[in-house]
């Protein structure tokens, strides 16, 4: 296991998948992981996603990328996060109040 330096994680949530990569501080990719997320299509051209599935995919990709990089979780100095595809509204108990609204759903 590499533990001689700090590392960073980049996460990208797209409309079809979640991706996470572990990088050293020189910007070198050490490992990455991807997980597809389901698009639900309904009448009226509505396109939605499960907020819970998105979060589960984020957690899976981060854990998998860190494990595949062979670095200690304690070596992670920061996380960059990008999500341009959806809106998630959560309630008081941190549970999603509705499905995610996807950019493709807009006219």
Placement of each model-derived feature along the sequence:
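N-terminal glycine/serine-rich phosphate-binding loop of ATP-dependent small-molecule kinases
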Residues: 1-99
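Glycine-rich phosphate-binding loop plus the immediately following alpha-helix
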Residues: 104-107
């Amino acid at each position: 296991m590499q533990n001689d330096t700090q590392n960073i994680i980049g996460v990208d949530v797209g409309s079809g998948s979640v991706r996470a990569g572990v990088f050293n501080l020189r910007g070198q990719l050490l490992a990455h992981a991807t997980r597809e997320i389901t698009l639900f299509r309904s009448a009226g051209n509505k396109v939605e996603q499960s907020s819970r599935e998105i979060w589960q995919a984020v957690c899976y990709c981060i854990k998998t990328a860190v494990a595949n990089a062979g670095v200690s979780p304690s070596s992670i100095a920061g996380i960059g996060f990008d999500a341009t595809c959806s809106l998630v509204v959560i309630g008081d108990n941190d549970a999603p109040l509705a499905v995610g609204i996807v950019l493709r759903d807009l006219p």
